[in-house]
Amino acid sequence: MDEVVSTASYASTVGSMTFRKTDHHKNAIDYEVAGLMWLAAARPDGAGIVEVLDHGKGWLTEPELSTGHPTREAAEDFGRRLAHTHAAGASHLGAAPDGFVPDDGYIGRAPLPLPSEPISSWGEFYAQYRIEPYMDSLDADARAIMSKLVDLLASGALDHDEPALVTCPAARTHGDMWAGNLMWTPDGVVLIDPAAQGGHAEEDLAALSVFGAPFAERIRAAYNEESPLADGWEDRIGLHQLHMLIVHCWLFGGGYVDQTVAIARRWV
């Protein structure tokens, strides 16, 4: 895969600063813009989403966000709001955001399959579209473990319900909710850089801990109060982290492989 060419610059506009992002990889900006607008449509009850001020072929402009300090109160407010973003729903697992013609999206620099047709179960979807596409980066021993997990997922044995407020076939997810994509502003958490899609809500919640988002436990606790999670959700955090981790295996290799395989072993 060719490396994504992505740059950023800042400009002052009437006392405020804007952030211009360019990315010349096929459809990357179109996907990001559609995702930001789709997630923002869950407002006013949903999570804060950075505004798209303008965009064109291969570029978008956003406001530069003022940074604040993470607090328990902001984390809990974000958890409750995220529950409502998820509840806005999607037509099916892997659904592209409205306004984006189904094609591969991106999670970071990695391609992200966005199937246009519904898949029969979460486990089948997760195995076929969120684990298998990245397994070619693993050595034979790691692939053997992951293949066992893929088979178990595809069987439906690990399927579980969405949170209580999600009544659509899939949640409206950010899709790349690692710590760096949560901006702690004076007005609360604002999300940036999505890989927006129809997904399982627990994946966003699990991703918070992959790189240690501040107050991740308080975010999940407040979410669970607002939209109760299915029994056993805490045990599934690792399972829902596997997509993000195997993407990092595909991109970077190294210690991510050991971490990914260790989680998979717990299930097989």
What are these regions, as identified by a protein language model?
Residues 1-15:
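ATP-binding glycine-rich phosphate-binding loop
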Residues 12-121:
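ATP-binding pocket architecture of kinase catalytic cores
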Residues 25-26, 55-59, 66-68, 131, ...:
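Short, solvent-exposed loop/turn segments at secondary-structure junctions
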Residues 57, 186-188, 242:
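Short strand-connecting beta-turns/loops that link adjacent beta-strands
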Residues 115-127, 166-172, 179-235, 254:
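Active-site Asp-x-Gly
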Residues 238-246:
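Hydrophobic alpha-helical segments that form the core
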Residues 248-268:
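ATP/Mg2+ or Mg2+-diphosphate-binding catalytic cores
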